[in-house]
Amino acid sequence: MNKTGNEKSTFTLAYFSTLLDGYNLTVSAPLIVILSRFMNLSLLDTALLASSALIGNAVGGFLMGRLPDRFSRKTLLIVDLLLYAVMGLFSSLSITIAQIIIFRMLLGIGIGGDYPNSSSLLAEIQGNTGRGKSVGFLGTSWTIGFGLSLLVGLLLYPLGPDAWRILLFLPVISSVVIIILRSHLNESTPWKKSREVAKRDNVRRIFSKELRVFTIYVTTFWFFFDAIHYGISEYAPLVMKTIGLHGNTTGIIASLILASVEVIGTLVGISLVDREGRRKVQIIGFLGISVSMLVAAFVTQEYVLIFVLFALGEFVGFGPGILEFIYPPEMFPTELRGTGAGFANSMSGVGAVIGVLIQPFILGLSNGVTYLFLMYAGMAFAVLMLTIAIAPETSSKAVITEMPEIQ
């Protein structure tokens, strides 16, 4: 399918906004490391700093995911970015830890709306051929944003006590540019055709008998995947210290390498996801995560463990790292697409928050690292079994534009 200039711009801006999503959702890891140099952060401070944007993401996915179905894909794409540009600015100007937490929580609400809206819009524009690759590249963009947050944090670490302000302010500039460019985009044609239908109670409809299995699957896999992924990415410095690797920036460096491996994994995944199918890629991804976490639980040599974690990154990117963007918009019709993807993103945010909040307490236990990796292995294995049992294959199907009346 040959894209028009407007469609190419839509894809490009979606990729860049998702890159900013990845940056903003994972910047807490270097933020905590930098703040710890100059402040005595409590365990509660650390947990709330790590989870604040994720909490907002969970709320935003539910509240703002529904709005594009009712009002406008284009308008909400601008509102989402405007919200987290403003809150990103306020975060960088904060004078207390509490203010950083509150503003980043509000920033997360904007991210929660951008996630489902961007993937829904791209799925509606892209034809059946190559849809997985085009939409899946959002996963690559997100992971690049993850890596950039770590790289910027690493570069800013040697600077003075205000380095964290620069870390939080940099995405604001890019957000403003994307907002201006998005204002010139066209509205989604499938959405314009379905807008009257979308005025119904969409949350209830995604649990109708026609869509219930899709909703259960996509929310469950995304919930557990984000619990694992954010639990590891947000606390990599703490994990590295616990397994015996010290140094103020060791965790950031390890996470940066992990993010680089994930990028490679996403590129491999999107090269196969249309040809081999969604189910096969997802199964391989969660199988790899399960095995990696199980091996990590019983490895005692620090550097072997790091190698295992890098293998984990490859499988994370290969499977769920791209399918969290591909699957949701393919499972719901146009009038429910933002609602369904938004609800799934909201539940993934809940999983991410749980993963982030419980990890410091587990690591504080004797043999805490072993328990942590065993827990993650169990989560991944449960999703693997669920995928084998009920995950649909959507690669050869056109995106659903409408469906029969749902009671």
Could you say what each language-model-derived stretch is?
Residues 28-29, 210-266:
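Extracytoplasmic gate region of multi-pass secondary transporters
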Residues 40, 72, 93-99, 127, ...:
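Helix-breaking motifs and short loop linkers at transmembrane-helix boundaries and internal kinks
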Residues 83, 87, 98-106, 305-312:
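Paired small-residue
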Residues 165-180, 372-389:
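Symmetry-related core transmembrane helices of the 12-TM Major Facilitator Superfamily/SLC fold
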Residues 9-43, 229-237:
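Extracytoplasmic
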Residues 103-140:
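Cytoplasmic helix-loop-helix junction between adjacent transmembrane helices
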Residues 59-97:
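Conserved MFS/SLC helix-loop-helix module at the cytosolic interface between two early adjacent transmembrane helices
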